[in-house]
Swiss-Prot record:
<feature type="topological domain" description="Cytoplasmic">
    <location>
        <begin position="190"/>
        <end position="211"/>
    </location>
</feature>
<dbReference type="InterPro" id="IPR013130">
    <property type="entry name" value="Fe3_Rdtase_TM_dom"/>
</dbReference>
<keyword id="KW-0813">Transport</keyword>
<dbReference type="GO" id="GO:0010181">
    <property type="term" value="F:FMN binding"/>
</dbReference>
<comment type="similarity">
    <text>Belongs to the MsrQ family.</text>
</comment>
<feature type="transmembrane region" description="Helical">
    <location>
        <begin position="171"/>
        <end position="189"/>
    </location>
</feature>
<dbReference type="GO" id="GO:0020037">
    <property type="term" value="F:heme binding"/>
</dbReference>
<feature type="topological domain" description="Cytoplasmic">
    <location>
        <begin position="68"/>
        <end position="81"/>
    </location>
</feature>
<keyword id="KW-1133">Transmembrane helix</keyword>
<keyword id="KW-0288">FMN</keyword>
<keyword id="KW-0249">Electron transport</keyword>
<comment type="function">
    <text>Part of the MsrPQ system that repairs oxidized periplasmic proteins containing methionine sulfoxide residues (Met-O), using respiratory chain electrons. Thus protects these proteins from oxidative-stress damage caused by reactive species of oxygen and chlorine. MsrPQ is essential for the maintenance of envelope integrity under bleach stress, rescuing a wide series of structurally unrelated periplasmic proteins from methionine oxidation, including the primary periplasmic chaperone SurA and the lipoprotein Pal.</text>
</comment>
<keyword id="KW-0479">Metal-binding</keyword>
<keyword id="KW-0812">Transmembrane</keyword>
<feature type="transmembrane region" description="Helical">
    <location>
        <begin position="10"/>
        <end position="30"/>
    </location>
</feature>
<comment type="subunit">
    <text>Heterodimer of a catalytic subunit (MsrP) and a heme-binding subunit (MsrQ).</text>
</comment>
<keyword id="KW-1003">Cell membrane</keyword>
């Protein structure tokens, strides 16, 4: 039984709630002492993990729609991607304002360059910014074939973001390893497309070097 357009609309409502409720919980936890001994780190890790969850959910949609024969599921992919960007922006903002402080924002650029795991994080965020900005149908029509080329960079984020998470924790725990494993699994499901993209990129580089 395939999903109807009305059911997908209700699914989108549920997904919006899934994006909003963690934020409401975080606000409650901040105001009622629900965080741990280092609340700044807790906020950073919570926002980062939530962004990663939405990234993984975004990557899951295409194979799920194909294997479950639910083509209308694709309509939820943009929504999930935008929530991923929103939480990634909260993650970056929490680091800039809470870790560095308002008076030390000038150090942000230096921090992003001198700390490799932060470099991976900001590269991922910039890609997500570009994908969010060009996610509308109007931008898709305007960019034409280049739109898909740009949005294929989500696979790079799927590689960089888990590495950023693993690199940022001082003690390796099961949680970041689980996220990394899920990312690898989802990328493996897109193996044929990734191989095609890699071969195309290699051919383009070879052609440019041959000129």
């Amino acid at each position: 039984m395939r999903l109807t357009a009305k059911q997908v609309t209700w699914l989108k409502v549920c997904l919006h709630l899934a994006g909003l409720l963690p934020f409401l919980w975080l606000v409650w936890a901040i105001n009622h002492g629900g965080l741990g001994a280092d609340p700044v780190k807790d906020i950073q890790h919570f926002t980062g993990r939530t962004a990663l969850k939405f990234l993984l959910a975004t990557l899951l949609i295409t194979p799920l729609a194909r294997y479950a024969k639910q083509p209308l599921l694709i309509r939820t992919r943009r929504l999930l991607g935008l929530w991923c960007f929103a939480w990634a922006t909260l993650h970056l903002t929490s680091y800039a304002l809470l870790e560095l402080g308002v008076n030390n924002l000038a150090l942000l650029g230096k921090e992003l360059i001198t700390r490799p795991y932060l470099t991976l994080g900001i590269i991922s965020w910039v890609i997500l910014l570009a994908l969010a900005f060009t996610s509308t149908q109007a931008m898709q029509r305007k960019l034409g074939k280049h739109w898909q080329q740009l949005h294929n960079f989500v696979y790079l984020v799927a590689i960089l973001a888990p590495i950023h998470y693993l690199w940022s924790v001082k003690i390796i725990s099961p949680q970041p390893l689980i996220y990394a494993g899920l990312a690898v699994l989802l990328l493996a499901l897109r193996y044929k497309k990734l191989r095609s993209l890699f071969n195309r990129l290699r051919k383009q580089v070879h052609n440019k070097l041959s000129v």
